[in-house]
Structures are given as structure tokens and as C-alpha cells.
Amino acid sequence: MDEEILDYNEQKEGWVSKMVDWQKKHISDRQMTLILAFIIGLLASVAGYFLHGIVHEIQLLLTSGFNKGTYNLLFLLFPIVGIYLTMLFIKYVVRDNISHGITRVLYAISTKNSKLKAHNCWSSVVASGITIGFGGSVGAEAPIVLTGSAIGSNLGQIFRMDKKTMILLVGCGASAAIAGIFKAPIAGLVFTLEVLMVDLSMASLLPILISCVTATCFTYILMGSKSLFDFTLTSPWALDRVPACLLLGIFCGLVSLYFMRTMSACESFFAKLSPYPYVKLLFGGLILSSLIFLFPSLYGEGYSAVNVLLKGQNVEDWGQVMSRSLFYGHNQLLILYIALVTFTKVFATSATNGSGGCGGTFAPSLIIGGFAGFLFARLWNVNQVGVYVPEQNFTLMGMAGLITGVMHAPLTGIFLIAELTGGYQLFMPLMIVCISSLLTISIFESHSIYALRLAREGKLLTHHIDKAALTLLGMQDVIEKDYHPVGPDLPMSKLVSEISRSNNNFLPVLDQAGVLLGVIDITKIRHIIFRTELYQHFTVRQLMMQPSAVLTEHDSMDEVMQKFDKTDAAQLPVIDVAGVLKGYISRTRIYSMYRQIVADMSAE
């Protein structure tokens, strides 16, 4: 049996290799990139369709018989069961970490030459489908972005694309995922630009557009033309609402800050429970189930709750958002219910992911934004602060404001909401809200929720071309190992012989275990090299000196450059945690490779 599997794998690899060789001879890489962009868009839309189907069928099976007028104790059970099934799937089938989908894509772009594992093409779809279907309060967007990006990455690896094209194909997958799941091609394009920070030149714009349009078209074919949000504009934009829009943007920025800080704190808390997975499951599951029991709007992605707010015209209509809860029928508590959902959604999302579920923060950002916008408008109107503001419009603008604040992506917020609802007449207020939200959150956080973790570790690829070039450089790219080590007791006469065989001015002094004791800098002993009468008086131990700084294998290129700047050294040794020499890095090699990367990034 094993021999048959081995033969099959060999035949498969041989067939793929022949196909790639044929492509290299007959189709240029530029043309192949466009073909792959189309395939990525198609596959991303199919993945989104399957995920939507899994979530819909599970939720239909579990909750279709629930009475909207009464609470249901099964809300206390379903989320825990879903997270437990997800844990089993990840532990025994996937056997890898698939959380933080968009952050994982950013990390792949920044530090791993855009390489994602093959199982990411499907594992997140299944895991998040189970989690969300059983009530996990997370979004499907991040898993689909990881899936689309993995499809692009693996196709790029199969066809042996270069690093720059790999980044582009990952961007195609991510943009196709957003475009497909929301039927919003422009939003998919600007998402890649703003969130994944992939620089778009004219050469890279076309493949991403092809992926976005392809994914959107096939999603329409598979799922119909119905929009995710059911919105009809009944109150056009009016100039006297500008102050309210500005204040809503500030409010969204502050809510975004609350969301990001709370999410980060909860992640840190659940990380401490990692050695105890079942304690984590029980604790997080109980928090999630309790919140969903009290506020059923937190069940799953929550888009249906936002649709209630968008379609409603009065308190009786909006009161339907409290169905299946203890609050149902008490419309006087609507504002309290909306406020509680707004500020507890982040705990439900954190508990879902922290206890072992799989999902993203994209949908939670939209839901919190929608509820926050409605809450702001309702309080404004009830208290008669100023001119009347339509709750439906402000629900939409709140979603755009939260997307902008949490993701630092104003264009994504504007175009996503406009494309989702057809509300292009709200462009002006959407821009006002998004700009004021971004300005507010930027005072406190300079990175998006996805980029924050990588930025702290110096692993984030940005639009700043100098920093991006350094990020793309890895320690393995610049480390050199063609050195001639010498022992500390070597006489100077033999040291001179070693110097004659060396191609650089750097000779490390090592003990028998390979631990770095010091270095010989030829430029510092040149004055005695030619005085043979002194050879018998000196050994390496007497001539060596301590390096002005040492590098470790895990230093980022920013840290490497800082040490070079502080020491003005030409070469610096690289050691491991035990002090064993692993190689050295020269200033000239870094600058040479840096210039090459900048040239590649700048080329069309």
C-alpha cells in the first residue's frame, strides 16, 4: 500500500513538473500570472460558497425550530459543542495552527517569501464553518482570506514564480476572497492595498482586478445577486448632518480602540491557558454561551441582526433584533440591549477564538460598527441633540467607521459599505465618518489590529520602501560562512598563514566547542604583520579583541542595521544562544542585497 502511494506521488510530481516545464517554454511568466489570477478568483469564490453553505446548513439544522418570542437554553450548549468539534478537527486532521488568518497572511508576505501551507487552501473553510455554524461569534472573512491567499501561494509555488510575483498572487487570493464573499470587487482591491499593504503598480493592478472581478462574477452565479445587507436609501444626505457625522467618526474611533485593546488583552489571557486546552475550552465556552443566551444577536456572524436595524422604520421593527432573548417584547429596553451587544461582542469574539474556535474579526468589526452607529443615532434622536439623523444611514456609516478604525483602512470601509448596499449616495458622509475615525484611532494606535502583532516584532512589510526592503531581507539571506576560524593559542606565525588564505578582514577566534572568544581584525594588526621578529612574542589570544557588537540568529534586519550604525563595524559575528558562531554579516553585503530588492520593488 505504501509503495502504491509513493508511486502515485512520484507520478503526480512528474506530471506537474512536465506541465511547469511546458509553461516556461510556451507561456511567459507575465501571461501565466494573468491566467493564475483568473484561476485564483474562481477557486476563491468556490471556497466562499462552500463556507457559506456549511454555516447556513448547520445554523438551519440547529436553530430553525426556535421560537423568536422566547429564550432557548440550547444557546448554552451549541457554541461549546462547535468549539469542541473545531478543536478536534484542528488537532487530529489539520495538526497545525490556523488562527489569525489575515495576520498569518501578513506574516507570510513579510517573512516567508509569501509561502503558505497547502492545507490552508481548505482547512480554515471547514474549521470556521463548524465554529460559526454552531454559534461562534466570529467572522468568515479572515478564514476565506487565508484560503484565497493560500491558493495563490501554492499555485505560485507550483509554477516556480519569483518572490515579487508570489506576493502578487497572495494579494490576488486575498482580494478575490473579499470581493467574492461580499460581492464587492473594488473593496477587494483596496483591501489588498490597505490591509495587506501590497504595493500596486500598473503591472500588478491588472491581475488583482482579474481575480476580484472573476470571484465576484462566479459568486453571483453560485449564490445569486442578493446583497448581504438589505438597505434602501430613504433619507438622502443633507449638509446639516455634518457635525453628527464627525462625532460618529470620533465615536467609532474610540470604539475601535476599545475593540483592539480588549481583544489584545483577552488574547494574552487565553494564551496563558494554552497548556490547559480543556480548561480554556470550558472557560471560554461558558463565557461565549452565556453571552449568546443573553444576547442571541451575538450568535454566529450576526449579519441578520444588522439587517433588522437596516430594514426597520420604528421601535417595533427594531425591537425584533431582541428576538429569542429575555429582552424580547420590552422595546423600551432597545437602547440598553443595543449598547450591551456593542460592548460585549468583543468578549464573545475573543472567547470564541481563545477557547479553540476558528474565525476572524472582520465580521465582528462590521457588527459592532453597525450597532454602534445605530446606538449613536438613536441616542441623538431621542435626546434631540440636533437635526434628525436617520438610524439606518448611521448604522451603515458606523460599519464603515469601525472597519476604518480597526483595520486602518478608510478606502475599504467606504467602498465595502457602498458596494454592499448600493448606497453610493452616502459617499460624502461615509468619507467624513471614515476620516474622523482614522484620525481618532491614529492618536492611540499606529497599526491595524492585524499588523499590530507583527509590527511589534519587526516583521511587518509596509508601504515605506526602505523599511519594506529591510523586512524582505532575512538573516539567512545575508549571513556569510566563508570564514577561517583560529584557536586562541595559535602562534602569530601560523596566524599570518591563515590571514593569507582569508578573503576578508574578519577572523573569528573559537574554542574547541565553537564558542566565539573574540575576533582578529586584520586592519588593527597590520603594523606588526610584516615584522617577523615579533612573531614569536605573540599568540592569537594576545592579538584578538572583543567584537564591538554581536548579532543573534533571531535579530530582525532593523536591529542588525541599528547595531551596524552604532558600531561603524564592517563585519559583525552571528552567534546562537550558546555563543556558538554561526557566521558573520558584512555591511557591504547588506547594502548590496538591499539595493537589489529596492530595484526589484521599484521595477514595473
Q: Which stretches of residues belong to each language-model region?
A:
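Structural signal for short hydrophobic segments within the conserved structured cores
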Residues: D482-V486, Q542, P547-V550
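Short hydrophobic beta-strand motif reused across regulatory alpha/beta modules
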Residues: L517-I525, Y584-Y591
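Post-kinase regulatory C-tail/linker adjacent to protein kinase catalytic domains
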Residues: E457, V540, M601-E604
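Alpha-helical transmembrane segments and immediately membrane-proximal extracytoplasmic
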Residues: M1-L472, Q476-D482, V486-L507, D511-L517, ...
